[in-house]
Amino acid sequence: MSKITTASLLKMKQDDQKITAITAYDASFAKLFDDEGAHVLLIGDSLGMVLQGGQDTLAVSVDEMVYHTRCVARGASNALIIADMPFMSYATPEQTYQTAARLMAAGARMVKMEGGDWLCDSIRHLTRNGVPVCGHLGLTPQSVHVFGGFKVQGRDEYQAQEIYRQALCLQEAGIQLLVLECVPVALAERITKALRIPVIGIGAGPATDGQILVMHDAFGITSGYVPKFTKNFLAETGDMHAAIRLYVQQVSEGTFPGPEHSFN
């Protein structure tokens, strides 16, 4: 696999080729995922839950994100590396720039921000200064207490229209990629068709331009609750390398996610 760039992902959308993404937090797994063909590695603030044992992502610091980004960058040769901007690290355009600068210096090639049109000024500020941005709409885990828990978003008409509107606004502000999390299949398909940029889904059905999973979910490393949208690829293969190859294959073929992993 040649080196993946934002231009590569855009061409994949245009050519109707599915994008495979997965979270990574260290050099060893980053190399494994990179070697087996994952296109995108996300250093997710999900590390606050799957590595640190927290109930949400809110306590993750910029320093921790920088550390894990540096680790992943050392292990990956070809995949596009995206780093999450942690909670309350992008409240103003200037703070956003300072956080993004640290993550990019650590090896990220794009930063991800959760939220809607209120981020547009910060997105423009970053893109003007050479920082590619990934948006994130639907279930945004940093807003878990606003939502009242980890719940599917966009099921009523008003909420669906608002997510659609915000997706268009973020695109016009300059994002080059969008993550859609836990939204109904029909809404995800509508947004994917409307946007010029690639849309990566998690719990958003098969119509998006690609899929992302938390690596622990893909390997069945869970502590009780298993989200509907996940699949244990390790259980089917018994080998981590084979598990990631199967994940990449099923995303590429469009067989994952299936109806049992999606919301209506």
Swiss-Prot record:
<dbReference type="GO" id="GO:0003864">
    <property type="term" value="F:3-methyl-2-oxobutanoate hydroxymethyltransferase activity"/>
</dbReference>
<feature type="binding site">
    <location>
        <position position="45"/>
    </location>
    <ligand>
        <name>Mg(2+)</name>
    </ligand>
</feature>
<comment type="function">
    <text>Catalyzes the reversible reaction in which hydroxymethyl group from 5,10-methylenetetrahydrofolate is transferred onto alpha-ketoisovalerate to form ketopantoate.</text>
</comment>
<comment type="pathway">
    <text>Cofactor biosynthesis; (R)-pantothenate biosynthesis; (R)-pantoate from 3-methyl-2-oxobutanoate: step 1/2.</text>
</comment>
<dbReference type="InterPro" id="IPR040442">
    <property type="entry name" value="Pyrv_kinase-like_dom_sf"/>
</dbReference>
<dbReference type="GO" id="GO:0005737">
    <property type="term" value="C:cytoplasm"/>
</dbReference>
<keyword id="KW-0460">Magnesium</keyword>
<keyword id="KW-0479">Metal-binding</keyword>
<comment type="similarity">
    <text>Belongs to the PanB family.</text>
</comment>
<feature type="binding site">
    <location>
        <position position="84"/>
    </location>
    <ligand>
        <name>3-methyl-2-oxobutanoate</name>
    </ligand>
</feature>
<dbReference type="InterPro" id="IPR003700">
    <property type="entry name" value="Pantoate_hydroxy_MeTrfase"/>
</dbReference>
<feature type="active site" description="Proton acceptor">
    <location>
        <position position="181"/>
    </location>
</feature>
<dbReference type="GO" id="GO:0000287">
    <property type="term" value="F:magnesium ion binding"/>
</dbReference>
<dbReference type="GO" id="GO:0015940">
    <property type="term" value="P:pantothenate biosynthetic process"/>
</dbReference>
<keyword id="KW-0808">Transferase</keyword>
<keyword id="KW-0963">Cytoplasm</keyword>
<feature type="binding site">
    <location>
        <position position="112"/>
    </location>
    <ligand>
        <name>3-methyl-2-oxobutanoate</name>
    </ligand>
</feature>
<feature type="binding site">
    <location>
        <position position="114"/>
    </location>
    <ligand>
        <name>Mg(2+)</name>
    </ligand>
</feature>
<feature type="binding site">
    <location>
        <position position="84"/>
    </location>
    <ligand>
        <name>Mg(2+)</name>
    </ligand>
</feature>
<comment type="subunit">
    <text>Homodecamer; pentamer of dimers.</text>
</comment>
<feature type="binding site">
    <location>
        <begin position="45"/>
        <end position="46"/>
    </location>
    <ligand>
        <name>3-methyl-2-oxobutanoate</name>
    </ligand>
</feature>
<dbReference type="InterPro" id="IPR015813">
    <property type="entry name" value="Pyrv/PenolPyrv_kinase-like_dom"/>
</dbReference>
<protein>
    <recommendedName>
        <fullName>3-methyl-2-oxobutanoate hydroxymethyltransferase</fullName>
        <ecNumber>2.1.2.11</ecNumber>
    </recommendedName>
</protein>
<keyword id="KW-0566">Pantothenate biosynthesis</keyword>
<dbReference type="Pfam" id="PF02548">
    <property type="entry name" value="Pantoate_transf"/>
</dbReference>
